[in-house]
Amino acid sequence: PIAGSMVLAAILLKLGGYGIIRMMQVLPPTKTDMFLPFIVLALWGAILANLTCLQQTDLKSLIAYSSISHMGLVVAAIIIQTPWGLSGAMALMIAHGFTSSALFCLANTTYERTHTRILILTRGFHNILPMTTTWWLLTNLMNIATPPSLNFTSELLIMSSLFNWCPTTIILLGLSMLITASYSLHMFLSTQTGPTLLDNQTEPTHSREHLLMALHIIPLMMISMKPELII
């Protein structure tokens, strides 16, 4: 069910990061060098999850693996134990909660009209539902952390803290972000462009679907541009 996927991606997946943040406050302070294997493992796991995304043909699986790759960055940022890293991790958990939930919602919008989640069979939506294509574009741009979204702010904080801790990590981070951009572009082009395989009886989008997407996108913009709204 779509509601379960949205709650799982937006809330339940973030409980692990929240638990690590709480445990870090309880544990005695240790040298960050002790956590080097875990930071490398988290970043390498993010890259592997991103590479897995490139191999997916199922839309829902692709979005699910995308969530896993972002949580790798969150874990790496928390373990460094710097204020910037912690702020970036919390911001990315909030930002990705909105983004992944919006992507699952869009995937369900596509599934309700095509009755399939295979990427190649859902193409050509820009001819039939242009407004939905706009939502897909905005959400994918958020997923690859373009300004002025909260994703950009959080990834900038994480990148700065990781680079300050160890400049070599910029290689793993850069590779991860490059692959993220690749599969996001692949997902958008596969589902929206090209000749459509649907008939002319496709159900139009409802106002509730547009409202739902607006309630995902607007907070991401507003929290980044006016953080005093929540702080």
UniProtKB/Swiss-Prot annotation:
Membrane-traversing stretches: 1-21, 34-54, 61-80, 84-106, 118-138, 156-178
User: Which InterPro entries does the entry mention?
Assistant: NADH_UbQ_OxRdtase, ND/Mrp_TM
GO MF assignments: NADH dehydrogenase (ubiquinone) activity; ubiquinone binding
Q: Which Pfam families match?
A: Proton_antipo_M
Q: What is its EC number?
A: 7.1.1.2
- Which top EC class applies here? translocase
Q: What subcellular compartments does it reside in?
A: Mitochondrion membrane
Gene Ontology terms, cellular component aspect?
Answer: mitochondrial membrane
What membrane topology is given?
Multi-pass membrane protein
| Keyword line | Electron transport, Membrane, Mitochondrion, NAD, Respiratory chain, Translocase, Transmembrane, Transmembrane helix, Transport, Ubiquinone
The Swiss-Prot or TrEMBL record describes its family as follows: Belongs to the complex I subunit 4 family.
Function as written in the Swiss-Prot or TrEMBL entry: Core subunit of the mitochondrial membrane respiratory chain NADH dehydrogenase (Complex I) that is believed to belong to the minimal assembly required for catalysis. Complex I functions in the transfer of electrons from NADH to the respiratory chain. The immediate electron acceptor for the enzyme is believed to be ubiquinone.
Q: What is this protein called?
A: NADH-ubiquinone oxidoreductase chain 4
